[in-house]
Amino acid sequence: MTRFRYGIEHECALLRPDGSFADFTNTTFDELQDIVDALPEDPADLADLRVGDAGIKRKRWYVEGYERFDEHGALLRCVPKGLEIRTRIHPSVEAAVAALRADQQRLDTAAAARGLGVTAIGFNPVHSEYVVEPAFNAWERRHRRVTPEERTAHLHMVTYGPDLNLSWAGSTPDALVDAARKLTALSPYLVPLSFSSPFRDGGPWGGLSARTALRTGARPAALAFLADGVPQVSAEPSLTQRARLPPEVGRLEFKAFDSCPDAALYGELLSLLTGLVLDTTLPQRRTTPDTALHRHAARVGYGDPALRAGAEQALDAAAAALADRPADSARVESLRARFDRDESPARAMLARYDAGDTVAGLRRP
């Protein structure tokens, strides 16, 4: 049986003590780092998790933001966006989901002790643009041109989403790249399952995923991590990336889902991705995401019969490929039930908002 290992990276948004949305306009790095400082550090995490050049990512939790550097490349500051939780790499979907839940609970407790609430939403509901100020210096201008992702890194300051990671044991570079191309092609049919960004600029924007509408075309849907020395695929946005740690070799990272409030949904989506990687019947392949189709999906979701049919095809193919994996099969069956109900976090958020509840700091006038 093909073996996979799993990891989840989950971006968390925050609410201030008065219930307003916390972001780069009203929150400091030190304020959020104080939460991280209260959480435990386990040196064993470092075998699986990358610390990064700035040293901010020493724990499973870290302050997510936009780093600014001086003229010599030394870190000056990190403008905060929110907090991120990263799990280690686990041998099963169940273990990865359980780890995320446990670390989410620890984060919720530490944030509450400092007057902040943790929430899940795919897009900043108040500010839809982050402006880089002051302008880049010469070192930053060079640095931000290195990869397509560096050139568009400012976009992530208003979006929140997961990286769902599958480490594929024994995969070849060609198979890994082919799987990333398949997931990139199928992405517009899959992402409505996760949509959680129906608000922007202070209210509903008329669609279900402001995150998808903004990021697609500039940011990857899926990445394949290849060993050093293996040729990369030239694409913008990227399809491949050089592995920075040994555990990253053979990893598929799906990046197009919105942030989800339910860890169980992440588990179901990981099983869906597993089935799609194992599937041998679906012909769809793309090196870069279909921008127009993603943006259409961001607005209408499965209200479009063609998008709905594409999702049904993907769910059916994944279910067939998982026939000998009962736990994954059960999760995809649960996901299919959500799909049949046209259920998504965005629709639940809009229903609460219409009922007069406060959602991510917003309340209906």
Model-predicted segments: where are they?
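Acidic, His- and aromatic-enriched active-site or binding-groove loops in soluble protein domains
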Residues: F136-T159
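Flexible glycine-rich active-site/ligand-binding loops centered on an Asp-His dyad
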Residues: L183-V191
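Inter-helical turn/loop segments and adjacent helix faces that build the functional surface
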Residues: S167-A179, V191-S197, A263
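An acidic/histidine-cluster motif and surrounding catalytic segment
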Residues: L164
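C-terminal accessory/tail domains of diverse enzymes
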Residues: M1-A98, T109-A110, R114, L155, ...
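N-terminal, Lys/Arg-enriched amphipathic/low-complexity engagement segments
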Residues: Q104, A111-A113, A120
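Well-ordered, non-membrane alpha-helical segments in soluble/globular domains
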Residues: A99-Q105
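Short, glycine/charge-rich beta-strand/loop segments that flank catalytic centers
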Residues: I85-I89, L116-V132
